[in-house]
């Protein structure tokens, strides 16, 4: 894995780059963002390809992991899907300290970031 430091006016952050690094990076993310609840937002396609992957990676991190699966596709980047995510967050008692992880591509990243 390689790391790239990005320095911008007023902020800086690190980007980790590599192949098959999620198992190494996810525990670090949880460790650097103290929480007892991780909410994963993904889509039906990713869920079929990687069932329980994040659960397995984080099983020894001592956090509760909840998974919100939404339909795949650009058509689902809308307020109805966002409302379903909000309902899910309320049902699993997510709070300000809960960590949300977008596990997927553009639509997942966009809608999770907005939520």
Across the structure, where does each feature detected by a protein language model lie?
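A short, small-residue-rich loop immediately preceding and capping a beta-strand
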Residues: 93-115
């Amino acid at each position: 894995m390689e790391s790239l430091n990005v320095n911008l006016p007023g902020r800086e952050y690190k980007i980790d780059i590599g192949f098959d690094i999620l198992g190494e990076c996810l525990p670090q993310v949880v460790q650097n963002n103290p929480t007892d609840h991780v909410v994963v937002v993904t889509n039906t396609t990713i869920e079929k390809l990687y069932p329980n992957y994040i659960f397995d990676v984080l099983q020894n991190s001592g956090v509760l992991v909840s998974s919100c699966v939404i339909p795949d596709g650009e058509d689902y980047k809308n307020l109805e899907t966002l409302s379903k995510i909000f309902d899910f967050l309320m049902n699993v008692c997510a709070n300000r300290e809960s960590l949300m992880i977008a596990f997927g591509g553009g639509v997942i990243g966009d809608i999770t970031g907005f939520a």
